[in-house]
Structure formats: structure tokens, C-alpha cells
Amino acid sequence: MRIIFMGSPEFSVVALSSILNNTEHKIVGVYTRVPKPAGRGKVLTKTPIHTVAEMHGLTVYTPKSLKRIEEQDRIKELNPDVIVVVAYGLIIPKEVLSIPKYGCINIHPSLLPRWRGAAPIHYAILHGDSQTGVTIMQMNEGWDEGDILLQKKLSIDEQDNIETLSSKLSNLGGAMLVEVLNNIDNLVPVAQNEDNATYTNKIEDFHIDINETAEVACRRIRALYPRAFVFFNGKRLRILQASYYYDDNISSLKPSSILNSGMHIKCKGNTILVPLVVQMEGKTLCSIKDFVCGYNVKDYSIT
């Protein structure tokens, strides 16, 4: 088949590589987001997909929108049998959805219809889900509402953070994509159950709420790794790894109380958050053991 691939972040790379390495299909074009300034030097930086595509000699397109007639005509000229979309970042208009013989298929890292939207992996961790998975669906004009072509489950380990779980789901999605492309004529699309639909939003708040339980705080640290933080005496302190426990003898203490020199933090109820790896703003990351050597932490406040 002739395939157009649309993707941008690191999560998309395994899917593109799986087509290149494990199928006989031909990629006739790769669409990705335009290069953007990044880092302190604001150097114009290509997306991971852009870099990988060029390494394989593939033609790369970086339109700012697919709504323009000129862009749609170019896709028609490429004559794809199918368009594969993996975290592309642009809206696919109905005019593009209808171009390929097999339409547009999308790899979505959740067990649809659970966790539609922009942050399904984050939400699975935040909500304490014991499992998630990958859904490959036939795209329509809705928000992750297309019929399911293939779906597989994946257990979430208690220590998984957004990086480790994303990697596992990316690998699973790549293998599933090969299966779908090689059997596309034999697949029977299954409609999603709208009664079970849940939705996610882009996450912009990375603050850890100490007034929640320590278990919820730990989920937040894992889901927002490595950006979750508390304020330590007014300065941002990132917590990159933590554990928690219960203590029935601390019910009289208010949340945010620092219990000992190891910086165990009282949270909601009788739960205690134990930071393990931290990073003070402007400093390098370190173990909590090294961090507390520089502070008498019980004299400081956590918010």
C-alpha cells in the first residue's frame, strides 16, 4: 500500500519505524509540525519524526494547516491508500479523511472510549487505572470517536511514570499498526460505546496539592514527570520520585507539616508523602538524602 504518515513527537517514532522495518508498504510522504525554536538558544528544532524521516530519505511536509485547498490537492497527488496518524498535532479535515481508499487510521494510547483527547496517558496514571492500552481506530470528524479496528490492553506498573508508560504504549502501538496494515481488508470496525466515553484535557498545572492524599500526590508526580512540584519556602521544588505510607498517629497535624529531617510531608488524612528524588529551581537534581543535608527542613514550609 501507499502510505502517508502524519506524526510529530517521540511517541510517533516507533510507529513510523515499524512500517519501515516490518512491512513492505511504501511511505509516499511524511507530515509533521513545523520546526520550532527550542532551548535557551532558541535554536530552530525539527520534530523527532522529521529527523527520523529524513534519515530514511523520506519526503517531509510541514504545513501549518491541512484546511487549505493546495494542501489537500497535494495529498491527492500523493495518492495514498491509507493515512496513518500518530500524535500529529493538526486537525484532519473531512476533505482529507475521505481521500485514501482505506481512510485515515489513528493510534490512540488508551482503551477507547475511555480517555479521549489530548492527555490519555497522563489521565490513566492520575486516576490510578490498573491498566490502559492502545486503540487503532478509523478516524472520523469526531474527537477520538472513530470505529475501533484493533485494541489491546497493557498493565500499568505501580512505578510507571509518563515516560516509561509512554514508551511501553508506543512499542505496543507500533506492533499493532503492522498487524492492522497487513490485515486491513479483513478487519471489522467496531463502534465505540458512547455511554462509556471519558475525556481528557491538556495539562497545564504541575503543582502538587498537599491537601490531597499522598497516594494522589504520588500519582501526580508520576503522571507529570519530571515537572511536578511543590513550593519549598516559596521556591519551586520539583519532586521526580516519591513514595507514601499511612500513619494513624498524625491525624492532629495539618497537611504540609514536615514530620522529620527526612522531609516526610503530611498530606490529607493520615497519609505521608516521602520525596525520594528532588530538584530545587536553578539546581541539579539529587536524592532527598543529599537535599536535606543543606537544610534544616523542619524550619521550612511546604505549599
From Swiss-Prot:
Pfam families, alphabetized: Formyl_trans_C, Formyl_trans_N
Keyword Acetylation annotated: no
One of the record's GO cellular component terms: cytosol
Keywords on record: Protein biosynthesis, Transferase
Gene Ontology MF terms: methionyl-tRNA formyltransferase activity
InterPro entries in the cross-refs: Fmt, Formyl_trans_C, Formyl_transf_N, Formyl_transf_N_sf, Formyl_transferase-like_C_sf, Met-tRNA-FMT_C, Met-tRNA-FMT_N
Annotated residues for binding of (6S)-5,6,7,8-tetrahydrofolate: 110-113
Chemical reaction(s) catalysed: L-methionyl-tRNA(fMet) + (6R)-10-formyltetrahydrofolate = N-formyl-L-methionyl-tRNA(fMet) + (6S)-5,6,7,8-tetrahydrofolate + H(+)
EC assignment: 2.1.2.9
Domain of life: Bacteria
Keyword Transferase: yes
Entry function: Attaches a formyl group to the free amino group of methionyl-tRNA(fMet). The formyl group appears to play a dual role in the initiator identity of N-formylmethionyl-tRNA by promoting its recognition by IF2 and preventing the misappropriation of this tRNA by the elongation apparatus.
NCBIfam families with a match to the protein in the record: fmt
HAMAP family for this protein: Formyl_trans
UniProt family annotation: Belongs to the Fmt family.
Name assigned to this protein: Methionyl-tRNA formyltransferase
Gene responsible for this protein: fmt
